[in-house]
Amino acid sequence: MNLRPEEISSVIKEQIKNYSMQLEVSDVGTVIQVADGIARIHGLENAMQGELLEFPGDVYGMVLNLEEDNVGAVLLGDMKNINEGDTVKTTGRVVEVPVGDALLGRVVNALGQPIDGKGPIETKKYRQIERVASGVIARKSVDTPLQTGIKAIDSMVPIGRGQRELIIGDKQTGKTAIAIDTIINQKGQNVKCIYVAIGQKASTVANIVKTLEEYGALDYTTVVASTASELAPLQYIAPYSGCAIGEEWMESGQDVLVIYDDLTKHAAAYRTLSLLLKRPPGREAYPGDVFYLHSRLLERAARLNDELGGGSLTALPIIETQAGDVSAYIPTNVISITDGQIYLETDMFNAGFRPAVNAGLSVSRVGGSAQIKAMKKIAGPIRIELAQYRELAAFAQFGSDLDADTKEKLAQGERIREILKQPQYKPMPVEYQVIIIFAATKKYLLDIEVSKIRSFEKELFEFIDTKYPEIPASIRDKKVMDEECEKALITAIENFKKEFTN
């Protein structure tokens, strides 16, 4: 064998030339205990709260507890292959999710990874899931309506862009239905939607995605799903991920709607984590910072000022109550954080009054500034007339000899209740809401039988569309009900009534 020294020396010289004295420093620790999705790690003196940790086998964890002699971390993946004695590295990063228009029409998990089988998400932009909410100076007051397409909400508890409105009610009262209808109603309104499913059955989420697809709403919607079968840490970070995806659009001057369905399960997932991390339990076994858990999430909803692009992020958190108990711990917390609540009642729902919005307990703390002028002008009496109806209906059960005035108030209340009923997945454009509410509040429905109100409404819209198309067009474009428009509407209703009663 012929050795050539000059060749060997040139290779060695080349390697010496390329040698660099760069050290790769990483803080490492050792797993001392792993169970229930929680790992305790010895070492990692420089770990930060919320930092990502790298475990063997491409599993990541997140630091939640910094104790004297160890670090408590939650695992964001399968813990099967993690054992005591394994080496863990810090990454110097916190949890990030992909953001941008590539996420529209997609279903992702809490880490932003696609789970809809439509291939990878083409985006180079990432955002940290936790962020300090915009300050007072960065915001401006809510003044643009976000139409839900639901008459009972848009007339009595209007929602503005940048508001946080809680949807609260028992199981099976139509909470998710209101949220989905609101998403469907944003078609063509230039609002991007994010639906965050926390701790729900995978089949339920699949049905929601299918519904959104059917109504053409998935094109402007991102679904972030952390189902009941997933680990508690993923359910815990899901709403923050959804919020981060929305903030990217908000900061580029767009309007975003985020639905958190629901925060009761989110709080339960956080309680699970906290108890496993041996944090001291408080009321209802929730940890002491469960208020901060939701306040730091919902406070990120905002309407930015014009210098920052004037974008908005509207939040509709959902809370599930037990037997209508609004004064439990989590419901009272979220009620105090949000700018109003839509309270859904089981009795109304079972009586066929759907959406089952209780007008007495539902409020919007933004109010009239989140309505178009036309709606503000005509929807005022509805709440009072409904309240009078409820009060009188209770008395009317006892006595039959009622005076004419009382009978009229009862009849008027019944008709208003009837026009507020609405089928699911049929949101109504605001101009048509204004027309039917105008007809009801101006007492044009008093001589129509209650059973015929729904068909009256349907046929009235058809009549106006064919003979007076300028009325809805005027309300839609000008957003006000001027004298001319009001006169035309009165004429249209009176002409239609002659046809309808004949």
Swiss-Prot record:
User: Where is this gene product found?
Assistant: Cell membrane
Task: Identify its membrane topology class.
Answer: Peripheral membrane protein
Q: Which Pfam families match?
A: ATP-synt_ab, ATP-synt_ab_C, ATP-synt_ab_N
Q: What is this protein called?
A: ATP synthase subunit alpha
Protein species of origin: Lachnoclostridium phytofermentans (strain ATCC 700394 / DSM 18823 / ISDg) (Clostridium phytofermentans)
Question: Which UniProt keywords are given for this protein, alphabetically ordered?
Answer: ATP synthesis, ATP-binding, Cell membrane, CF(1), Hydrogen ion transport, Ion transport, Membrane, Nucleotide-binding, Translocase, Transport
Domain of life from the UniProt record: Bacteria
S-S bonds: none
Which parts of the sequence bind ATP? Answer: G169, D170, K171, Q172, T173, G174, K175, T176
Q: Which gene encodes it?
A: atpA
Site (Required for activity) at S362
Family listed: Belongs to the ATPase alpha/beta chains family.
What EC class is this? translocase
Q: Does the keyword Ion transport apply?
A: yes
